[in-house]
Amino acid sequence: MSHLINYEIGEVPVITYEDAMSRYGSDKPDISFGMLIKDISDIADDCGFKVFSDTVRGGGKVRGIVLNEDVSRKDIDMLTQEVAKFGAKGLAWIKMTAEGPSSVITKFFTQKELSNIVSRFDATVGDTLFFVADDEKDTAYTKDAITGLSQEIGGFTPGAHTLHAVCSFDAE
């Protein structure tokens, strides 16, 4: 087939439906960029932010993504409204500043917890972290919504399209 399009496709990666949903939030993920969902449920389990700790103790997840962009408050509000359409109850965020993590929620975390969150996301100055606390399925769908909206606010630059196959679909 490569002779028809004058392009060598190479090996096509295969990922399971479960991996696609847990890592990308979609059964049709754009895997050409590195915006992966990260689970911080283990960090949030005992934190002082009850929205997170109560969700984890109730069997839910706290998951998030990092946008390599200093997102404005207006854009955060827009993202919050948009993820609500996907069933999210809210959208927590932390901005990475030269002084460290900054947000209305940081006061509920210990320095060690904040350090672990920053490390989990490999976050640096100028990044904005977004979190959703909910059941696993809803946290995945919310990430897909944020990914789409991040194109509009400039926090995402897609690379070349990457072919892949998704297999082992859930029976639902």
Task: Tell where the protein language model's regions lie, with residue ranges.
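Class II aminoacyl-tRNA synthetase catalytic cores and aaRS-like
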Residues: 1-172
